Amino acid sequence: MAQQKSAAAASQRARKKVKKNVADGIAHVHTSFNNTIITITDRQGNALSWATSGGQGFKGSRKSTPFAAQVAAEVAGKTAIECGIKSLEAQIKGPGPGRESAVRALNSLGIKITEIQDVTPVPHNGCRPPKRRRI
């Protein structure tokens, strides 16, 4: 009985990821003042690849640099190219410093950027913003 469970568990773990073959998709670039998250999805919103600045080994204040966003975009883009991505629509959200460099990095990989949208949410006088920094 115990062997049957372990054999079933082993076959479940050994199941290989199915590579999707998608020609075009959407690059969701979420930039904050602390980190940059890049998710590449198909048109339906199913994630094909993703990467973050912190996941690429950048820690602390270096996560929020344009270079860290560029490295994360290259990692996500290479995985997306393996899935067959040829062109992307970029949706950029947030005020961070890695906005432009992430899109440039995807373009330099040979992925055609067809459209760039700014989908940063703007409050209609909602929550009170954080107080100004005094240095």
From Swiss-Prot:
Keywords for this protein: Ribonucleoprotein, Ribosomal protein, RNA-binding, rRNA-binding
Protein family (similarity comment): Belongs to the universal ribosomal protein uS11 family.
Subunit field text: Part of the 30S ribosomal subunit. Interacts with proteins S7 and S18. Binds to IF-3.
GO terms, biological process: translation
Organism the protein comes from: Polynucleobacter necessarius subsp. necessarius (strain STIR1)
Function (record text): Located on the platform of the 30S subunit, it bridges several disparate RNA helices of the 16S rRNA. Forms part of the Shine-Dalgarno cleft in the 70S ribosome.
The name this protein goes by in its record: Small ribosomal subunit protein uS11
Keyword Manganese recorded: no
SUPFAM superfamilies per the UniProt record, alphabetical: Translational machinery components (SSF53137)
